[in-house]
Amino acid sequence: MKRLLIVQPGEKLASLMSVRGDFADWVRAGMGLGEADTRVVYPHRGEELPDAGMFRAVVVTGASAMVTDDEPWMLRGALWLAETVRAGIPILGVCFGHQWLGKALGGEVTDNPRGTEVGTVTVMLTPPAADDPLLSGLPATLPLHVSHRQSVTLLPPGAVRLGASVMEANQAFRYG
């Protein structure tokens, strides 16, 4: 079976790393995978993103960077994300990864006009979430941990909103 590709575009705080591991560790633990089941790439360190067709799916983690910084690695990565979506490879974007994916697909990312959202928030799923392969079967409201200053303020053309909170209209979306 093909491995899962984890794209980690940033580092965690050192104080959290010693207690909970890195973002890639969180993804592996949450999905019940070992290191042999995954490959981790760090584009912010200059690592090239591989041919996504070699993997069964992609998870793009969070980062402390801001998507709107438009650093060269972010711009290259956005092209890679859009190509990967066009190739039909499933991608899950989490936090920064969600915003990066939204921007790569033609959406808009800005500082959240309602301010920074941090802590455990209630995310309300939309009716289309009931038929979503990832979210179907979950309760209509979920307590989720968040920490972000920026938001996908305009969904990519053709995207479907799957979840929102009081401060964030686009907590989750599906594209394609």
What residue spans do the PLM features occupy?
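Structured helix-beta-strand junction loops
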Residues: 34, 80, 87-88, 141, ...
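Short glycine-/acidic-enriched loop or helix-start segments at secondary-structure transitions
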Residues: 16-17, 69-70, 102-104, 156, ...
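Active-site phosphate/pyrophosphate- and oxyanion-stabilizing loops and adjacent acidic/basic residues
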Residues: 25-29, 99, 132, 149-150
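N-terminal beta1-alpha1 cap of cysteine-dependent amidohydrolase-like domains
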Residues: 1-87
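Surface-exposed, flexible loop/turn segments at secondary-structure boundaries
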Residues: 12, 46, 66, 99, ...
